[in-house]
Regions:
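Conserved, structured core segments of small domains
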Residues: 8-142
Length: 142
């Protein structure tokens, strides 16, 4: 069976993996000042990850009030305003990183500013045959 794990090769020939860091937080729990400080810290983290070659992509998301959910059941599309689940913490952003292993991904996740008051979920990224693959520099592979 072909290895389908989300791995990249580094310059030393070692295996690298892509991880998605999903940032969950309670949007209402942050003041405007705390949010601005969080964005500044996140920008610094992104610059640091970029300098070490671990940054692939990152972005905050607009508030959950702007979300639209789409479901298809029995061939019929249902579009609703808002998120699928009603929970206190909502998906607020993400980082896509290149890490040597889960331990390295955890060390990066603990530096994500919203981890101080929210949750950062770490998920390995799976590559599927037939889909374009991303190089470690964040660009699609030709």
């Amino acid at each position: 069976m072909k290895d389908r794990s989300p791995k990249l090769r580094d310059d030393a020939g070692g295996r690298r993996m892509k991880y998605m860091l999903l940032v969950y937080l309670d949007e209402q729990a942050m003041s405007d000042e705390e949010r601005a400080h969080c964005y500044a810290e996140s920008a610094q983290l992104t610059q640091n990850l970029n300098a070490t070659g671990q940054y692939l992509a990152a972005s905050p998301l607009h508030p959950v009030s702007t979300a639209t959910s789409v479901r298809v059941r029995e061939g019929k599309r249902l579009v609703t305003d808002g998120p699928f689940a009603e929970t206190r913490e909502q998906l607020g952003g993400y980082y896509l990183i290149d890490a040597g292993d889960l331990d390295e991904a955890i060390r990066i996740a603990e530096k994500v500013p919203p981890a101080k008051f929210g949750t950062v979920e770490i998920r390995p990224v799976m590559e599927i045959d037939g889909l374009p693959r991303m190089e470690s520099n964040g660009l699609p592979r030709n």
